[in-house]
Structure formats: C-alpha cells, structure tokens
Design a protein with these regions (language model features):
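Short amphipathic alpha-helical surface patches that mediate protein-protein
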Residues: 62-63, 91
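Extended hydrophobic/Leu-rich segments
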Residues: 8-13, 72, 86, 90
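A short pre-motif secondary-structure segment
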Residues: 57-58
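DNA-recognition helix of helix-turn-helix
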Residues: 76-104
C-alpha cells in the first residue's frame, strides 16, 4: 500500500465543502441533518475568514470539474500565483474547516 501525506480529515472536509458549494443558501438547509448544518456553518465561517481573492480561489478550484491537483495546476497561472501558494491556501482552508468542525 503506497504511503500518502493525506490528512485523516481531508475526505470528510472535501465532502462538507462540496455540500456547501451545492447548497450556498442557508435557507436550503431545512430538512438536512444536524451534521450537514454543522458542516455548512464550518465551511461558511472558514471562507468568511479568508481574503476575498482566496475565497474566490477556493470556490474556483473546488468548483472545477476535475481533480484538485489538476485544478491547482491550471489556476495557478490564472491567479498569477505559484502552485505552492495555491496548495498553501487550499490546505489552510481544509485545516481551518476541520478545526471549526471539531475534527482536530
């Protein structure tokens, strides 16, 4: 089995972020589980704490219809940033959502 640097909370947070991106209005949360609501609030809070440009970057990368690795590579030039910088933003966002959600 190959080794990976993937954090244990990454898949959970990615699921929460995708749910948030498809349910951008809190009024659409009626009937969803308490866990879905907590996930939504965690993502909303983490995004609101970021600079506007980083919020746009996260939304663009997550919303791309391709694996995150490919989206980061593609959008680095568009945002005039290095891939390393984009990964720093994405990983920081993921970690912040995990903290807000109580996963770490």
């Amino acid at each position: 089995m190959p080794m990976t640097n993937k954090k244990f909370y990454t898949d959970y947070v990615n699921h929460a972020v995708r749910f948030y991106m498809t349910t951008p209005d809190s009024l659409q949360l009626a009937g969803h589980s308490p866990a879905d609501l907590a996930n939504w609030v965690s993502v909303q809070t983490a995004l609101s704490e970021m600079p506007q440009e980083d919020q746009e970057l996260v939304r663009t990368v997550v919303g791309a219809n391709e694996p995150t690795e490919m989206a980061v590579r593609r959008f680095a030039d568009r945002y005039d940033r290095t891939m390393s910088d984009l990964w720093t933003v994405m990983n920081g966002f993921t970690k912040r959502v995990a903290v807000l959600r109580g996963l770490i």
